[in-house]
């Protein structure tokens, strides 16, 4: 297992490295946020461990940027035992969190649990231009969508972008505000009901007797799920 740990506390990294070695994990440790994100983009990793408080770029920002292109499992580290930090991490796409100070054995156990869940949930296979799941093949370059091998016709540009983003992040719940930011862009100042309208249209175009695909999470937002 290839792990990238972005943590500015050298002592924590040194202690953790010994336990990773015993488990047979291949780990790289980076102590700067911006440098750590750069390392993420340069290689393929099986798991990312992120401290929230980092120089140059904080862990929450790194997590959000990673989730723009990847479903790699992410564990957040925080020195603050507060619910707000945990919620922010989960909202940005983290899979789990560990509160400092922690036992390396606890971190190893969390890593194994996250990897088990990751393998069991059938995350999307993603590269720069293509997403392939059990039911969908989505080509970002040609903007083509296949559902069970059949083309999905007449998607508007924003419908395609919204579907691509949700399929890229399976089972992750997004608020309307988050979807406006991620799909329409930070410069978009429209009504949040715009998201509802696009979801409704997508559901009609993806109509399936077996699976709804796009689910409403009442009081929160929407998620994509093939189960």
From Swiss-Prot:
The keyword RNA-binding does not apply. One of its GO terms (cellular component) is cytosol. Pfam families: Response_reg (PF00072), Trans_reg_C (PF00486). Disulfide bonds: none annotated. It is found in: Cytoplasm. GO terms for molecular function: phosphorelay response regulator activity; transcription cis-regulatory region binding. The keyword Membrane does not apply. The modification 4-aspartylphosphate is found at residue 51. GO terms for biological process: regulation of DNA-templated transcription. Could be member of the two-component regulatory system YclK/YclJ. PANTHER family: DNA-BINDING DUAL MASTER TRANSCRIPTIONAL REGULATOR RPAA, REGULATOR OF RPOS. This is Uncharacterized transcriptional regulatory protein YclJ. It comes from Bacillus subtilis (strain 168). The lineage of its organism: Bacteria, Bacillati, Bacillota, Bacilli, Bacillales.
């Amino acid at each position: 297992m290839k792990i990238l740990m972005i943590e500015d506390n050298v002592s924590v990294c040194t202690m953790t490295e010994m336990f990773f070695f015993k488990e047979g994990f291949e780990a790289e440790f980076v102590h700067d946020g911006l440098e750590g994100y750069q390392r993420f983009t340069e290689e393929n990793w099986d798991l990312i461990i992120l401290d929230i408080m980092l120089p140059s770029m904080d862990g929450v920002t790194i997590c959000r940027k990673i989730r723009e292109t990847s479903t790699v499992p992410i564990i957040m580290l925080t020195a603050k035992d507060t619910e707000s930090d945990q919620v922010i991490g989960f909202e940005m796409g983290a899979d789990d969190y560990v509160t400092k100070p922690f036992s390396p054995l606890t971190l190893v156990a969390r890593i194994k649990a996250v990897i088990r869940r990751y393998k069991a949930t059938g995350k999307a296979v993603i590269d720069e231009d293509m997403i392939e799941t059990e039911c969908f093949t989505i080509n970002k370059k040609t903007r083509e969508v296949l559902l069970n091998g059949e083309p999905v016709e007449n998607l508007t540009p924003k419908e395609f972008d919204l579907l691509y983003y949700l399929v890229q992040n399976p089972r992750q719940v997004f608020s309307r505000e988050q979807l406006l930011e991620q799909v329409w862009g930070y410069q978009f100042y429209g009504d949040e009901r715009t998201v509802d309208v696009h979801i409704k249209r997508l559901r009609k175009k993806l109509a399936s007797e077996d699976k709804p695909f796009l689910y409403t999470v009442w009081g929160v937002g929407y998620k994509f799920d093939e189960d």
